[in-house]
Amino acid sequence: MNEPRFSRLHTSLQQGFTLSPNAILKEAWQRIHGAKLPIILATLGVVGVWLVLNQLLVTISGDEEELSWEVNLLGLVISMLMAPMTAALDMIGVHRAADKTVRPNQIFDYFKFIVPLAITSMIMGLLTSLFIPLSLSVGLSPIVGMIPTMLMSIALMFTFPLIIDKGFTPLQAITTSLRLFSRQWVALFSIHIMLVLVFVVAILSFGIGFIWAIPLYMVTKGIIYRQACGIDSLDMTNSNQDPTATPPSKDHFDA
């Protein structure tokens, strides 16, 4: 991590980094202009593939109470296939944070990372699924277990981009993501609470608000990643946003 391309990430891990929730959300709002349609189409593509594959799993399993080993294997394959597409949604946000154009078919760009992403997805699923059963086992309400589950989900938000952008192994990406979260957990939690409120408004608008809420969520995550880690996998030469520069001010945006 002593290479120049890791300088921002190294600084964030050693000295911390600054996040202004209002400034980040404001910049994200600016950056979704001109990108809402491809982001929505990409999201629909991922959801569509997930629904088709899971319907296939339900069809094969039938009404059996216990899934056969063949069905379990198919479920594992589905998780492996979906991991690069899920990671692609994160990378679309990173692209917009770097002032790059995005494409709906970008969801198919990261299958070369399928092995580390699939392994990471399974580990992350295990980590985020521990708390509710644990709370039930000690007689607590499942709502109590939802709080650490949400925090763990937020803490792992850097994981997929670290694998694709930095070339980290699954364990390196997970531990690094947790360390980054510990540096700015209050700001990260606050930002996600604001995004939850945005999604609540989207639901109350009979779904129309998702046209803005989904791109805002993805681009916000991309900006946070840029601020904490820098962006190495994209050519930043012609971009006005330098990933190793100080965070943009509230009054200046490149979108």
Regions found by a protein language model. Name each.
Residues 1-255:
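Hydrophobic alpha-helical membrane segments
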